[in-house]
Curated annotation (Swiss-Prot):
Extent of Polar residues compositional bias: 163-181
GO biological process, alphabetically ordered: microtubule anchoring
Signal sequence, start to end: none
Gene: CCDC187
Basic and acidic residues bias locations: 146-160, 219-233, 431-442, 472-484
Keywords: Coiled coil
Region annotation (Disordered) ranges: 1-41, 62-184, 219-278, 300-319, 392-484, 496-539, 551-658, 1010-1030
GO cellular component: centrosome
Protein name: Coiled-coil domain-containing protein 187
Any one Gene Ontology molecular-function term assigned to this protein's record: microtubule binding
InterPro entries from the UniProt entry: CEP350/CC187
Length: 1063
């Protein structure tokens, strides 16, 4: 903002003001925060700002209070308090006193001395200060640098404050942030600012310690801490009555500026830059000069311990604070100051904040005397502690005592709440009172955060590595332990060893973030956080190293039993320095006490930090520890290998599970297949004897060949052709033929539609396994055909069994006897069939009409549905096709044993021709009776021979001659007749059975009674007379007719034709 240059004051109150150079315009309370008012100020108040250039006139602007003694030229000028001024009157009217505004910082709430942003013109321009009705004689031309009493007095007051704070040289440095230090810093900034307002200082003071670099650094730091100083300045206004400012005035002006915040114009920015540089020069010089003086007089400050985890300013990066730049400049004046800037400033911050009200009222000599006394007391205390330690342990004992004393001093300053909150009392003396004795110091030392770790000499590297040192401050060549310890020691016994090699690597330890642009790292960084050093005056590196060594060796007795062992991260320093007695050990051991003292000086983090917020963030950003503490680090290769192994294991497990599942499935499948196979074998290959031992009177008809397409009911004219498959002798057990067993096998057509396969016996040898239709007749009476059909009857097999015969034969009957009976029955049956044919032919010949009556339907039947009765195969090759179960079906075959059948030669069977209903063969008077008694007594008119020729052979003799042997072989077992009258031969009887539903079309064999086995009455064996035997009764063989089937038996007959053997 444009301001007025101090010029020649107007001679009268109403004179028009003369405009001054706008580059040198001063920012006033009307111009800083309110650009609109700046124009008014420029237009109206300019003439009031011009004053004669008299060097003595500046004295009128100095502080009315503390002292009127001239100060050294490097002292900062006083700032006029707001209470010394009166309210401004209307323009054109003079007011009693000038009023100095706080400048732009007042708007921000920072009225304390900061980086000198209030107004000292640079570049030869006169100082333009904001005022209200200022007397003209107060201001004079400021064309040349002046060293007025106001500046000296201001500087003297500031030095008094600093000396009262034991010469702290790190009030603006990296000391622990605390409310006291903040207040003190705010007050010092305010003092410095007002001093700069009072007088325009020289652009570049000639005193030592000043430099453009320091001014620039100071300005940057002031800007960085500008946000912090806003609230602090307000607090300092109330807490520093020495300044005699009216807080309301400051706040009102601040409010005025805050109400209309606008961006500063370029001219104002340039002016602010100049003023900042000038004010920074003054403030920096005052601070540095006081710092150097205090340190030169008082020596090293005591240690303020702090916890690493709670102290943001412990990190090496935090050393880059407001005090770093000044610390480097002060190092030029005092080598001790270069080494001990941070902790000293921290200590002075805490004390000055508590003592600021009374510091300004004292003269500089008194302040210096007080500071000298305090430092002397501290020096004596430290010396006594060192001597006591040396007396106890010699070279090794020196370290523990020194460490205890340092611990005592640091704790007296920081551990004590009173000392920490207010340092108006001598903290060193208080520390001396509290911890004057070595034992007491030891007891205090035991509960220090680093005492437990120091006692752990077995793990030196853990303590170093566990330090929360910032990796950003670690150079590659410097180990973590060395960097962490050296960067984090608040005050070290090596403070005086600026020439030691540790100083070099301490500078290396300082990360780029911890080094200011223009500050020499070797001077600033070696001991960045050593606020106090018990050995600050020790020029000998070896002596400092001895102190460090002894610090490193506290011994187990220093640990408090009640103390909880601090984790490695909390162990600031350990016995690593003691174990490394060599030069390298020194280098590393030196850092140990520093870290220990760093833990010993817990800088309060609750209050504002000394570092600017931005800088603190920058320095705290790289703070995260290395990942070593988080657990064992794994390389990407190891992780990939681990994942590969896991994937392979999963794949293997999946493959194993799949293979196991496959094996289980295969095993189950095999088991199921085996079960199914066994079931099939049980069903298909059941070992069921065709001829049972207990019932040897079974006759089995095994189908050899049949018309598979013509399986119809027996009542149909197209009944399937029935053929003899084989006739065997011997008993069949299971799937094999037992020697001497008897089976009569022929093709059957069952009346029922169910088809049964012959299980296991292989069926007929000709390979044609025709299905069989079962037809049963209710006229069978005692025949148990259905039982066998439902239980054991295989397909293509018909078993006729007379239960009585079975019971009679049983196991008591000899097999040979049964065979004979079967043979006899077969012979009788054959004879009967032949006799019936002969009789039929004879009757046919005798009666032409009767013959015609009988022949025509027979021929039609043969032509329409030819049937053949195959010749029985040779008995030399007996093979039963299918097994059957006993005791179910069976006509009343005789008991004749089929054993003799083997010797019989089969011949083509000449089956008789059956006639349909209505056709009757005149065989004799008993035909009708036989027919009425047993409908199975199917008779044929005459044997017709082979029906496949389509004609009936009328040569009965020839037919009889050819058919005797087969019928003998086909005679059923002896005594196989049932209770009912059954006198037909087996073949004709079987044809008759075909019509009976109970028998299931048992038209293949006619049952025979036991008396038909060569023993009974010839009447029971109508064919006996044919074979030259016993009582042939032709009247017992009726021809099939309507009258021959009184029981509703189906009247369709099958014509058997003898076929040649197929074996």
């Amino acid at each position: 903002m444009p301001t007025l240059v101090v010029g020649t004051p107007p001679t009268c109150l109403g004179d028009t003001p003369q405009p001054c150079h706008k580059n040198s315009q001063r920012q006033g309370p009307f111009s800083h925060g309110a650009p609109g008012r700046a124009a008014d100020w420029k237009a109206v108040a300019k003439p009031r700002l011009c004053a004669p250039a008299a060097e003595d006139d500046v004295a009128a602007l100095r502080w009315p209070g503390p002292s009127q003694q001239p100060d050294p030229p490097w002292a900062a000028p006083h700032v006029v308090g707001s209470d010394d001024l009166k309210e401004p009157g209307p323009w054109g009217k003079a007011c009693s006193l000038p009023m100095w505004s706080t400048g732009p910082e007042a708007r921000d709430g920072d009225s304390s001395v900061s980086s000198g942003r209030l107004s000292c013109s640079s570049g030869g321009h006169d100082v333009c200060v904001s005022w209200k009705e200022r007397p003209p004689q107060v201001l004079g031309p400021q064309q040349r640098p002046r060293k007025s009493d106001a500046r000296l007095e201001q500087l003297r007051d500031k030095i008094r404050a600093q000396a009262w704070q034991q010469g702290s040289c790190a009030s603006l440095g990296t000391s622990a942030p605390s409310s006291a230090s903040r207040l003190h810093k705010a007050s010092t900034l305010m003092l410095r600012r007002k001093g700069q307002e009072a007088k325009n200082p020289p652009p570049a003071p000639e005193c030592s310690g000043f430099s453009i670099l320091s001014a620039a650094e100071r300005r940057v730091e002031a800007k960085a801490s500008h946000g912090q100083g806003r609230e602090l300045s307000r607090v300092s206004q109330h807490q520093v009555p020495v300044l005699r400012e009216k807080p309301k005035r400051v706040k009102s002006s601040s409010c005025k500026r805050e109400k209309t915040p606008k961006l500063p114009s370029p001219r104002r920015a340039a002016k602010d830059k100049h003023k900042d540089e000038d004010s920074e020069l003054v403030g920096v010089y005052a601070w540095r000069k006081g710092q150097a003086l205090v340190r030169s007089l008082l020596g090293p400050p005591p240690v303020l311990r702090r916890h690493h985890s709670k102290d943001p300013s412990r990190d090496p990066a935090l050393t880059v604070d407001l005090g770093d730049s000044e610390k480097v400049i002060a190092a030029k004046c005092s080598p001790v100051c270069a080494q001990l800037p941070d902790a000293t400033s921290a200590y002075s911050d805490q004390q000055v904040s508590g003592n600021t009200p009374s510091l300004a009222s004292f003269d500089q000599p008194a302040t210096i005397q007080t500071a000298m006394a305090i430092l002397q007391d501290l020096r004596q205390q430290i010396q006594a502690g060192l001597e006591l330690a040396q007396a106890r342990k010699g070279g090794q004992e020196l370290g523990p005592s020194k460490r205890r004393l340092q611990d005592v001093a640091g704790r007296g300053c920081c551990r004590d709440p009173n000392a920490q909150s207010s340092f108006s009392k001598s903290p060193w003396a208080m520390t001396e009172r509290k911890h004057s004795s070595l034992e007491r110091a030891r007891s205090v030392h035991t509960w220090e955060p680093w005492s437990s770790s120091t006692a752990r000499e077995s793990c030196p590297q853990r303590a170093w590595g566990a330090q929360g040192q910032d990796r950003s401050f670690q150079r590659p060549e410097s180990p973590h332990e060395r960097l962490g310890h050296f960067s984090q020691r608040p005050w070290s016994a090596l403070a005086g060893q600026a020439c030691s090699p540790q100083r070099a690597w301490g500078a290396q330890r300082q990360g780029p973030s911890s080094q200011r642009p223009g500050s020499p790292p070797e001077k600033r960084s070696p001991f960045p956080q050593q606020p106090w050093s018990a050995v600050a005056t020790q020029p000998c590196p070896r002596r400092a190293w001895t102190a460090c060594e002894t610090w490193e060796d506290p011994g187990p007795r220093l640990r408090n039993p009640l103390e909880r062992p601090s984790p490695p991260a909390q162990r600031p320093w350990s016995s690593s320095g003691v174990q490394r007695a060599g030069p390298q050990g020194k280098g590393r051991g030196i850092g140990s006490p520093v870290s220990a003292a760093k833990h010993a000086l817990p800088r309060p983090t609750g209050s504002f930090p000394q570092n600017p917020l931005g800088k603190e963030k920058d320095t705290l950003r790289p703070c995260p520890r290395s990942r070593g503490l988080l657990g064992p680090s794994h390389s990407s290769e190891s992780l990939r290998e681990f994942m590969r192994q896991k994937a392979q294991a999963r794949r293997r497990q999946a493959l194993e599970e799949k293979a196991s599942a496959l094996r289980t499935r295969e095993l189950r499948s095999r088991r199921l297949q085996e079960v199914y196979r066994q079931q099939r074998e049980a069903v298909l290959g059941r070992a069921v004897p065709v001829v049972s031992r207990t019932t040897p009177g079974i006759v089995t008809f095994v189908p050899s060949s049949a018309q598979s397409g013509g399986l119809e009911a027996s009542g149909s004219l197209e009944s399937p052709v029935l053929e003899w498959s084989k006739v065997t002798s011997g008993m069949v057990l299971g799937g094999q033929e037992a020697p001497g067993s008897f089976c009569l096998c022929l093709n059957r057509a069952w009346n029922h539609a169910e088809t049964l396969d012959p299980p296991g016996m292989g069926g007929p040898q000709d390979g044609r396994d025709a299905p069989v239709l079962l037809s049963a007749s209710p006229s069978l009476g005692s025949l148990e055909l259905q039982d066998l059909t439902t239980r054991y009857l295989p397909r293509g097999m018909c078993i006729y069994l007379d239960p009585k015969e079975a019971e009679h034969l049983g196991t008591s009957s000899s097999l040979h006897l049964r065979h004979k009976q079967a043979q006899l029955q077969a012979l009788e049956t054959t004879a009967k069939v032949l006799k019936q044919r002969v009789d039929s032919l004879t009757a046919k010949l005798q009666g032409a009409e009767a013959l015609d009556t009988v022949r025509d339907p027979a021929v039609g039947l043969l032509r329409s549905c030819p049937h053949s009765l195959p010749a029985a195969p040779t008995l030399a090759t007996p093979t039963l096709a299918t097994p059957a179960c006993p005791g179910a079906l069976g006509p009343n075959w005789g008991r004749g044993a089929p054993g003799e059948w083997v010797s019989m030669q089969p011949q083509p069977l000449l089956p008789p021709t059956y006639f349909l209903d209505g056709e009757t063969l005149s065989w004799g008077p008993s035909w009708e009776q036989q027919q009425s008694v047993s409908p199975r007594a199917h008779c044929e008119s005459k044997p017709r021979g082979f029906p496949e020729e389509g004609h009936v052979d009328v040569k009965p003799d020839k037919r009889l001659q050819r058919g005797v042997a087969p019928f003998q072989a086909l005679s059923p077992s002896a005594g196989s007749s049932y209770a009912g009258p059954a006198t037909l031969h087996p073949i004709w009887g079987s044809l008759g059975l075909e019509e009976t539903p109970s028998v299931g079309g048992a038209d293949s064999v006619a049952p025979c009674t036991p008396r038909s086995c060569g023993k009974g009455d010839p009447a029971d064996r109508p064919w006996a007379g044919w074979s030259g035997g016993r009582g042939i009764h032709r009247e017992h063989l009726p021809l099939p007719s309507t009258r021959a089937w009184p029981y509703g038996v189906e009247k369709s007959f099958s014509t058997w034709r003898a076929s040649t053997p197929r074996y």
